[in-house]
Amino acid sequence: MSNLLLGVNIDHIATLRNARNTTYPDPIYAAFIAEQSGADSITIHLREDRRHITDRDVEMLCKTIQTSMNLEIAATDEMINIACTLKPHCCCLVPERRQELTTEGGLDIINKANKLQDIIFKLTEAGIRVSLFIDPNEQQISVAYNIGAPYIELHTGMYSHATDATTQNLEYKRIKKSVQYAVNKGLKVNAGHGLNYYNVRPIAMLPGIQELNIGHAIISRSIFCGLPKAIQDMKKLIQDSRRG
C-alpha cells in the first residue's frame, strides 16, 4: 500500500499574527518547523480579502519551502496572475465567499468547466501542478477529468462535521466511492477539510488517497504540545492508519 503524505496548512499561524497586527508568529518560520517535523508539503490559502496569509507570505514561502508548496486560490484573474508570477509547486483552485469563516464546499466545476479548463491550461503551462477542490460527487469528478485536471482534492467537511454516526458513515461511503471512481479514471486524489486526530483514521485508510491536507486541528493541538509534536503525532496517526 502506498505511503500517505501529510500537507500541513499554516493559515492559522497567520490568523493569530493578524489578530493583533504584529509580525509574529511568523508563517515562514512555522513552515520551516513543519518541514523539519515531517510535513510533506505546506498549504496556504491566499484569500481575496487577505484575512490571514498575505502576498508577502506567499512570496517568502515560495523562496524558502524545501518540500512542496500548495497554494490555494480562487479562480480569479488576480489570483491566477499571482500564481503564474510566483510559480508555487501546486495550486489548488477553491471556491471563496467573503463572509465564510472557512471554505464551505467544493468548486461547482460543472457550471464553470470552460473557465476552469482555461485556467488549468494556463497554470500547467507555467509549470504548476493543478488540483481542484471538489465535493465527493461522481459527476464533478467526471468533469474534472474531462477538463484536464491531474489532481483533485476531495472536500471532507460533511464527513468531518457530521453530528451523528449514521450521517458520518454515509459521508464516509460517499468519499470512499468517489476515491475509487477518481482513481479508476486515472486522477490523483488528495483530501482535506475539517479532519482532526479523532476522525482522520477512516479517511487515511483509503488506499487511493495520496495526501491529506490538515491545518486547524494541528495548529490547535500545537498550543498545548508544540508544533513539532502536533505534526509528528498526526503523521504517525495517518501512516499507522494507512498500514492498518
From Swiss-Prot:
Feature type site, description Transition state stabilizer: E153
Catalytic residues identified in the record: H45, E72, H193
Residues that hold 3-amino-2-oxopropyl phosphate according to the record: N9, R20, G194, G215, H216
Keywords: Cytoplasm, Pyridoxine biosynthesis, Transferase
SUPFAM superfamilies according to UniProt: Pyridoxine 5'-phosphate synthase
Enzyme Commission designation: 2.6.99.2
GO BP terms, alphabetized: pyridoxine biosynthetic process
An annotated GO cellular component: cytosol
UniProt cross-references to InterPro entries, sorted A to Z: Aldolase_TIM (IPR013785), PyrdxlP_synth_PdxJ (IPR004569), Pyridoxine-5'_phos_synth (IPR036130)
Domain of life where this protein originates: Bacteria
Pathway(s) the chain acts in: Cofactor biosynthesis; pyridoxine 5'-phosphate biosynthesis; pyridoxine 5'-phosphate from D-erythrose 4-phosphate: step 5/5
A Pfam family matched in the record: PdxJ
Location in the cell: Cytoplasm
Catalytic activity: 3-amino-2-oxopropyl phosphate + 1-deoxy-D-xylulose 5-phosphate = pyridoxine 5'-phosphate + phosphate + 2 H2O + H(+)
Principal cellular location given in the protein's record: cytoplasm
GO molecular function, one term: pyridoxine 5'-phosphate synthase activity
Known role: Catalyzes the complicated ring closure reaction between the two acyclic compounds 1-deoxy-D-xylulose-5-phosphate (DXP) and 3-amino-2-oxopropyl phosphate (1-amino-acetone-3-phosphate or AAP) to form pyridoxine 5'-phosphate (PNP) and inorganic phosphate.
HAMAP family: PdxJ (MF_00279)
Family of this protein: Belongs to the PNP synthase family.
Name of the protein: Pyridoxine 5'-phosphate synthase
Gene name of this polypeptide: pdxJ
